[in-house]
């Protein structure tokens, strides 16, 4: 059976995920079969297993670091926040229920059985399971119902390392205070501390480390981990934006602006663009950030979102829908990924309950279509002649396909999710399906430009994306299209980008970053002590 180690933290965003990732890499390099595990994750950034199950992106990164295939059991409960205390619950990789906080807590006994079952499934297949906690184990108002911190540690009898981020200030108070708020049997599981994200001379910490050891019954600090600069690994949700993802145009660079939609998912879709020399990637949430005509971005991107109907309302409330249309008319390329692609349609159809407005009074319904109970039908952005469809129960899966230019793309998403606008022919053969509607309104003006073509065909001959005849407006159903260097660079060249060097292999870059992180931890943790704590 597998040995276990658990990483808990004094608060959110103290580095638990990165520490878990680095340790997965470090021990897998020693020849151990390592699995990451997080009982419950709350995140909009997700990934799909080879079996088509959805898990948190952090666990996907950790599994890649460990060199093991991703499994739904590594993150049995994924909460995708929708706002207003409402979350979509993904259970063992499949959509389960949409619940409010009080409803969720009533389901904890059932969810705990899923957590323990997942651990039982993983244990025979691995030598070491590295478990990540969530937030703090000392949230005394939540402890009675938690299924992700000390309850997991007690179930596994796992040794726990408690991590604190010294860059936040007050790290010794955080560590000691957390210990004091734990029950005696919980404190007994804490075997040591990690001080993360240190900048400066570690010798200055010695008096504090000694006092912490004395105050906590001789528990050692397993390591003081210095800040690691420019680590290029996928992060959870808005942390990237909080740490500088918002920016301004930079002279001499191809400027690409991503609309920061409510419920935005898959931030790492755009990492390959940001990594290209000569590209400035930024996130915006107001028309003012687009700048006057001479400083408009070369491209706007509508990303994926867990709440697409709400995002449409948000775009209109902020006048961003009109701004996108105006930018398109001024020659700015407009692209959509996943749900962002489906929002580009003449109309969108979805299920009420995510905070979307009802269908506007007097809004014309497409001929022959009747809304089912609980559905809403709204005008889309009108950038492409299709109807986007959103179903919270829809299943995402791994997808691959070819563009018309022969570029192979791989990723994941909903293979359907859209149909040609009523009266148009299906564009699966790339033929013109009808006039392009007026951007932002859902209406098709007379004399509209030539209609789009299906530029991406998925396995099974299903169209996976549309683009306008001039190529400036396009959308793709799958996340991960920018990982394909041929497709990515072809599009960047159309924006005026000058190619510099050969395309970067994202998987190779990721492997190097995993090793850099593992080397960093190996150099700054007491590995002999850590091995003894784990029992290996």
List PLM regions with ranges.
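Flexible phosphate-sensing "switch/lid" loops adjacent to ATP/NTP-binding sites
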Residues: 2-326, 333, 392, 403-430, ...
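A conserved active-site-flanking secondary-structure segment within enzyme catalytic domains
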Residues: 345-362, 371-420, 499
